[in-house]
Protein backbone atom coordinates (compact mmCIF):
# COMPACT_ATOMS: atom_id res chain seq x y z
CA UNK A 1 0.00 0.00 0.00
CA UNK A 2 1.53 3.29 -1.12
CA UNK A 3 1.25 6.20 1.31
CA UNK A 4 1.78 9.93 0.92
CA UNK A 5 2.17 12.76 3.42
CA UNK A 6 0.93 16.29 2.70
CA UNK A 7 2.65 18.81 4.95
CA UNK A 8 6.13 18.20 6.31
CA UNK A 9 6.07 20.08 9.60
CA UNK A 10 6.27 18.53 13.07
CA UNK A 11 3.49 15.99 12.51
CA UNK A 12 4.48 15.26 8.92
CA UNK A 13 8.07 14.50 9.90
CA UNK A 14 6.94 12.10 12.62
CA UNK A 15 4.51 10.46 10.19
CA UNK A 16 7.47 9.89 7.86
CA UNK A 17 9.18 7.98 10.67
CA UNK A 18 6.02 5.93 11.10
CA UNK A 19 5.65 5.29 7.35
CA UNK A 20 9.24 5.68 6.09
CA UNK A 21 8.43 4.78 2.48
CA UNK A 22 5.87 7.58 2.17
CA UNK A 23 6.08 10.18 -0.57
CA UNK A 24 6.16 13.80 0.67
CA UNK A 25 4.50 16.94 -0.63
CA UNK A 26 5.04 20.34 0.96
CA UNK A 27 4.91 23.36 -1.37
CA UNK A 28 6.37 25.71 1.25
CA UNK A 29 9.44 23.49 1.63
CA UNK A 30 9.44 22.77 -2.12
CA UNK A 31 9.19 19.04 -1.52
CA UNK A 32 7.50 16.63 -3.90
CA UNK A 33 4.64 17.01 -6.33
CA UNK A 34 0.87 16.78 -6.06
CA UNK A 35 0.95 14.18 -8.82
CA UNK A 36 3.09 11.92 -6.62
CA UNK A 37 0.56 12.10 -3.79
CA UNK A 38 -2.26 11.32 -6.19
CA UNK A 39 -0.76 7.96 -7.13
CA UNK A 40 -0.78 6.93 -3.44
CA UNK A 41 -3.48 4.68 -1.99
CA UNK A 42 -3.58 6.69 1.25
CA UNK A 43 -2.76 10.38 1.77
CA UNK A 44 -2.13 11.74 5.27
CA UNK A 45 -3.02 15.43 5.63
CA UNK A 46 -0.68 16.99 8.21
CA UNK A 47 -1.12 20.71 7.58
CA UNK A 48 -1.63 23.58 10.06
CA UNK A 49 -5.05 24.50 11.47
CA UNK A 50 -4.03 27.76 13.11
CA UNK A 51 -6.26 29.99 15.20
CA UNK A 52 -8.09 32.77 13.38
CA UNK A 53 -8.47 36.24 14.89
CA UNK A 54 -11.95 35.36 16.16
CA UNK A 55 -10.64 32.22 17.89
CA UNK A 56 -11.99 29.75 15.33
CA UNK A 57 -9.91 26.96 13.83
CA UNK A 58 -8.66 27.76 10.31
CA UNK A 59 -9.42 24.67 8.23
CA UNK A 60 -8.79 26.30 4.85
CA UNK A 61 -5.50 24.51 4.13
CA UNK A 62 -6.99 21.13 5.08
CA UNK A 63 -9.94 21.69 2.74
CA UNK A 64 -7.66 22.88 -0.04
CA UNK A 65 -5.74 19.60 0.24
CA UNK A 66 -8.92 17.50 0.30
CA UNK A 67 -10.06 19.28 -2.85
CA UNK A 68 -7.06 18.23 -4.96
CA UNK A 69 -6.03 14.89 -3.44
CA UNK A 70 -7.15 11.95 -5.59
CA UNK A 71 -5.91 9.11 -3.37
CA UNK A 72 -8.38 6.34 -2.55
CA UNK A 73 -8.35 7.39 1.12
CA UNK A 74 -7.57 10.69 2.82
CA UNK A 75 -6.62 10.58 6.50
CA UNK A 76 -6.80 13.94 8.30
CA UNK A 77 -4.14 14.17 11.03
CA UNK A 78 -4.68 17.91 11.64
CA UNK A 79 -7.03 18.83 14.49
CA UNK A 80 -10.33 19.99 13.00
CA UNK A 81 -13.68 21.14 14.46
CA UNK A 82 -16.37 18.63 15.38
CA UNK A 83 -18.35 17.78 12.25
CA UNK A 84 -15.67 18.93 9.79
CA UNK A 85 -14.80 15.49 8.40
CA UNK A 86 -18.43 14.65 7.70
CA UNK A 87 -18.88 18.00 5.92
CA UNK A 88 -15.88 17.26 3.71
CA UNK A 89 -17.18 13.79 2.86
CA UNK A 90 -20.54 15.27 1.91
CA UNK A 91 -19.03 18.14 -0.09
CA UNK A 92 -16.31 16.30 -2.02
CA UNK A 93 -17.77 12.77 -2.11
CA UNK A 94 -14.41 11.29 -1.09
CA UNK A 95 -13.37 8.65 1.42
CA UNK A 96 -12.04 10.61 4.40
CA UNK A 97 -11.09 9.50 7.91
CA UNK A 98 -10.10 11.60 10.90
CA UNK A 99 -7.21 10.22 12.94
CA UNK A 100 -6.08 12.52 15.77
CA UNK A 101 -2.37 12.98 16.32
CA UNK A 102 -0.85 12.57 19.78
CA UNK A 103 2.74 13.48 19.01
CA UNK A 104 3.06 16.45 21.36
CA UNK A 105 5.80 19.06 21.12
CA UNK A 106 8.39 17.86 23.62
CA UNK A 107 11.50 15.95 22.56
CA UNK A 108 10.75 12.87 24.65
CA UNK A 109 6.97 12.82 24.25
CA UNK A 110 5.77 9.25 24.92
CA UNK A 111 3.65 9.14 21.76
CA UNK A 112 6.35 10.18 19.29
CA UNK A 113 6.45 6.75 17.66
CA UNK A 114 4.36 3.71 16.82
CA UNK A 115 5.00 2.13 20.23
CA UNK A 116 1.82 3.78 21.60
CA UNK A 117 -0.72 1.15 22.58
CA UNK A 118 -3.79 2.64 20.93
CA UNK A 119 -4.98 4.27 17.72
CA UNK A 120 -8.32 5.93 17.02
CA UNK A 121 -10.10 6.46 13.71
CA UNK A 122 -13.33 8.28 12.88
CA UNK A 123 -15.35 7.94 9.71
CA UNK A 124 -17.50 5.61 7.65
CA UNK A 125 -16.75 1.96 8.57
CA UNK A 126 -15.44 1.01 5.12
CA UNK A 127 -13.07 3.99 5.08
CA UNK A 128 -11.92 3.32 8.65
CA UNK A 129 -11.20 -0.31 7.74
CA UNK A 130 -8.97 0.84 4.89
CA UNK A 131 -7.09 3.15 7.29
CA UNK A 132 -6.63 0.29 9.74
CA UNK A 133 -5.36 -1.90 6.90
CA UNK A 134 -2.58 0.64 6.27
CA UNK A 135 -1.56 0.65 9.94
CA UNK A 136 -1.65 -3.13 10.28
CA UNK A 137 1.47 -3.18 8.12
CA UNK A 138 3.47 -1.37 10.83
CA UNK A 139 1.85 -2.18 14.21
CA UNK A 140 1.50 -5.36 16.22
CA UNK A 141 -1.70 -7.00 17.39
CA UNK A 142 -1.31 -5.63 20.94
CA UNK A 143 -2.27 -2.13 19.78
CA UNK A 144 -5.88 -1.23 20.64
CA UNK A 145 -7.79 0.22 17.71
CA UNK A 146 -10.77 2.45 18.51
CA UNK A 147 -13.32 3.07 15.77
CA UNK A 148 -16.26 5.45 15.75
CA UNK A 149 -17.89 8.11 13.64
CA UNK A 150 -15.76 11.14 12.79
CA UNK A 151 -17.54 13.56 15.13
CA UNK A 152 -16.94 11.33 18.18
CA UNK A 153 -13.22 11.16 17.47
CA UNK A 154 -12.97 14.87 16.67
CA UNK A 155 -14.64 15.62 20.01
CA UNK A 156 -12.33 13.22 21.85
CA UNK A 157 -9.30 15.11 20.52
CA UNK A 158 -10.67 18.42 21.82
CA UNK A 159 -11.46 16.78 25.16
CA UNK A 160 -7.86 15.62 25.43
CA UNK A 161 -6.23 18.97 24.71
CA UNK A 162 -8.74 20.95 26.76
CA UNK A 163 -8.20 18.64 29.72
CA UNK A 164 -4.42 19.04 29.46
CA UNK A 165 -4.80 22.83 29.35
CA UNK A 166 -7.04 22.60 32.41
CA UNK A 167 -4.50 20.45 34.23
CA UNK A 168 -1.63 22.85 33.48
CA UNK A 169 -3.72 25.77 34.72
CA UNK A 170 -4.73 23.92 37.89
CA UNK A 171 -1.14 22.98 38.72
CA UNK A 172 0.04 26.55 38.17
CA UNK A 173 -2.63 27.83 40.54
CA UNK A 174 -1.64 25.24 43.16
CA UNK A 175 1.96 26.41 42.75
CA UNK A 176 0.95 29.99 43.57
CA UNK A 177 -1.16 28.87 46.53
CA UNK A 178 1.71 26.76 47.87
CA UNK A 179 4.09 29.70 47.63
CA UNK A 180 1.58 31.97 49.35
CA UNK A 181 1.25 29.49 52.23
CA UNK A 182 4.98 28.93 52.55
CA UNK A 183 4.74 25.33 51.29
CA UNK A 184 7.35 23.52 49.16
CA UNK A 185 5.31 22.88 46.01
CA UNK A 186 7.62 20.18 44.66
CA UNK A 187 7.36 18.12 47.84
CA UNK A 188 3.59 18.55 47.92
CA UNK A 189 3.41 17.65 44.23
CA UNK A 190 5.22 14.34 44.72
CA UNK A 191 2.90 13.36 47.58
CA UNK A 192 -0.12 14.32 45.46
CA UNK A 193 1.18 12.29 42.50
CA UNK A 194 1.47 9.16 44.63
CA UNK A 195 -2.26 8.79 44.00
CA UNK A 196 -2.38 6.88 40.67
CA UNK A 197 -5.64 8.57 39.69
CA UNK A 198 -3.83 11.87 39.11
CA UNK A 199 -1.23 11.06 36.43
CA UNK A 200 2.19 12.71 36.24
CA UNK A 201 1.96 14.32 32.82
CA UNK A 202 1.61 18.12 32.61
CA UNK A 203 2.35 18.66 36.33
CA UNK A 204 5.65 20.53 36.08
CA UNK A 205 5.52 24.27 36.73
CA UNK A 206 8.16 26.30 34.89
CA UNK A 207 8.70 29.51 36.83
CA UNK A 208 10.00 31.35 33.75
CA UNK A 209 7.26 30.01 31.46
CA UNK A 210 3.96 29.93 33.31
CA UNK A 211 0.74 28.44 31.97
CA UNK A 212 0.17 26.60 28.71
CA UNK A 213 1.37 27.69 25.30
CA UNK A 214 2.58 26.07 22.09
CA UNK A 215 0.83 25.29 18.82
CA UNK A 216 -2.01 23.12 20.11
CA UNK A 217 -3.51 23.84 23.53
CA UNK A 218 -4.30 27.57 23.12
CA UNK A 219 -5.89 27.20 19.69
CA UNK A 220 -7.83 24.07 20.57
CA UNK A 221 -9.38 25.41 23.77
CA UNK A 222 -10.31 28.57 21.86
CA UNK A 223 -11.84 26.54 19.04
CA UNK A 224 -13.96 24.29 21.26
CA UNK A 225 -15.18 27.36 23.21
CA UNK A 226 -16.37 28.93 19.96
CA UNK A 227 -17.96 25.68 18.81
CA UNK A 228 -19.82 25.49 22.12
CA UNK A 229 -20.97 29.10 21.77
CA UNK A 230 -22.36 28.28 18.31
CA UNK A 231 -24.37 25.53 19.99
CA UNK A 232 -25.50 27.95 22.72
CA UNK A 233 -23.62 26.02 25.43
CA UNK A 234 -21.99 28.03 28.24
CA UNK A 235 -18.31 27.39 28.93
CA UNK A 236 -17.78 29.00 32.32
CA UNK A 237 -14.98 26.60 33.24
CA UNK A 238 -13.12 26.99 29.94
CA UNK A 239 -13.58 30.78 30.09
CA UNK A 240 -11.94 30.79 33.52
CA UNK A 241 -9.04 28.64 32.27
CA UNK A 242 -8.37 30.99 29.36
CA UNK A 243 -8.56 34.02 31.68
CA UNK A 244 -6.19 32.41 34.19
CA UNK A 245 -3.75 31.45 31.44
CA UNK A 246 -3.78 35.04 30.16
CA UNK A 247 -2.87 36.14 33.68
CA UNK A 248 -0.04 33.58 33.83
CA UNK A 249 1.30 34.52 30.41
CA UNK A 250 1.49 38.16 31.53
CA UNK A 251 3.61 37.00 34.47
CA UNK A 252 6.06 35.61 31.92
CA UNK A 253 6.54 39.09 30.49
CA UNK A 254 7.58 40.64 33.80
Feature-to-residue mapping (PLM):
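NAD(P)+-binding Rossmann beta1-loop-alpha1 motif at the extreme N-terminus of oxidoreductases
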Residues: 1-42
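Short, well-ordered alpha-helix to beta-strand connector turns
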Residues: 19, 39-40, 71-72, 93, ...
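Rossmann-like NAD(P)-binding element
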Residues: 33-73
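Interdomain hinge/lid region at the active-site interface
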Residues: 151-154, 166-254
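Hydrophobic anchor at the start of a short beta-strand
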Residues: 3, 21-25, 74, 94-96, ...
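Rossmann-fold dinucleotide-binding core
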Residues: 47, 79-157, 224
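Short, well-ordered alpha-helices that flank and scaffold nucleotide-derived cofactor binding pockets
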Residues: 17-21, 67, 90, 226
Amino acid sequence: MKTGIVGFGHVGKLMKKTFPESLIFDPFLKLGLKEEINICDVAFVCVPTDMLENGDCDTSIVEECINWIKSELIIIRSTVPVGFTDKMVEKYKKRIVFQPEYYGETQDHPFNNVSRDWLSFGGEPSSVNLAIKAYQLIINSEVKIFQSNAADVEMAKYMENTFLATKVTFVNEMFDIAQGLGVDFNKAREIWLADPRIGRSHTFVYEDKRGFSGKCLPKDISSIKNQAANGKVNTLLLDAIVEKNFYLSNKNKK
